[in-house]
Design a protein with these regions (language model features):
Chain B
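Cytosolic covalent-transfer regions centered on His/Cys nucleophiles
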Residues: 1-156
Length: 115, 156
């Protein structure tokens, strides 16, 4: 797993959790089951800290894709992109160098996260 | 939701008859590793981070010895439940400060097309709200005994 993709996946999970905590309907459903859901501020702090660890160009790519899709980072299973369910060409690999391009699905443009 | 439907999220390889860990963080790690070991999760570290973060919003120890850690992760492709027991009990920071003995880890993918995540969470909470069911679950020593107990809880 590339650290660069891993951090973007972390950011995505964190932003999803923030969205759920911010959504009164989803928060109420969990609370009705007996769970406590507090601490939006600490999630936002964690997000700020994480943002500082992500290279600027990776963050820009992530945010650009997030404007188009709900998920910017999607898992790859059996060489299928689980964002658009198309097979990936063999030229796409899980190996990501520190400075090279992020692994992107040619078909939908999402960032690929190898399981 | 039928018993069969609920049981479809569990599995023999996701049944832990006795947890080794004695701490909350250890239990979360041990249960996340179960999913990683069966190839359900690519990266247990990513999953674990999400579960720990969810716990920071409030313990999922619901009281009466039951904990239901849960969350959605980019590392998950399908909704899965790990069921684990700790006969000695683990301090999970539960609302009633009682040690937890019954653990259900629910992990769902980021995109929940079938909208199964919250109803599933609700069903688990409902099943374990019955004291007799909790007592029987504490005694199960095999996955078969577990599924039998769940079916009985549904009156089947
Ligand atoms: Zn794609």
């Amino acid at each position: 797993m590339s650290d660069r993709v891993q951090r973007l996946a972390q950011l995505q999970d964190l932003e999803l959790m923030i969205r759920e905590v911010e959504d009164p309907a989803s928060k109420m459903k969990e609370e009705a089951l007996g769970f406590s859901v507090e601490g939006l501020a600490q999630l936002q702090n964690a997000r700020s800290r994480l943002l500082k660890q992500i290279p600027k160009q990776d963050l820009r790519a992530y945010q650009r894709i997030r404007r188009k899709y709900d998920r910017a980072v999607v898992p790859v299973m059996n060489r299928i992109c689980l964002g658009c369910f198309q097979a990936l060409p063999t030229s796409v690999t899980r190996n990501v160098s520190e400075a090279g391009p992020l692994p992107i699905c040619e078909n939908c443009g999402r960032i690929l996260y190898w399981l | 939701m039928t018993a069969e439907r609920l049981l479809s999220y569990f599995g023999e390889s996701r049944f832990v008859p006795e947890l080794r860990s004695r701490s909350k963080d250890g239990v979360l790690g041990e249960m996340a590793r179960v999913l990683a070991d069966e190839g359900e999760i690519g990266d247990p570290a990513l999953l674990l981070e999400m579960i720990r973060r969810r716990e920071s919003l409030g313990s999922t120890g619901l009281g009466k010895g039951v904990a239901v850690p849960h969350g959605r992760s980019t590392a998950a492709t399908d909704t899965r439940i790990v069921f684990a027991l700790s006969k000695k009990g683990v301090d999970f920071g539960a609302l009633d400060n009682e040690p937890c003995r019954l653990f259900f880890l629910i992990v769902a993918p980021y995109e929940d097309r079938k909208h199964e995540y919250l109803p599933l969470l609700g069903k688990i909470v409902e099943v374990v709200s019955d004291e007799a069911v909790r007592e029987r679950l504490l005694q199960v020593d095999s996955f078969g005994a577990f599924t039998q107990t769940i079916r009985e809880a549904f009156g089947e």
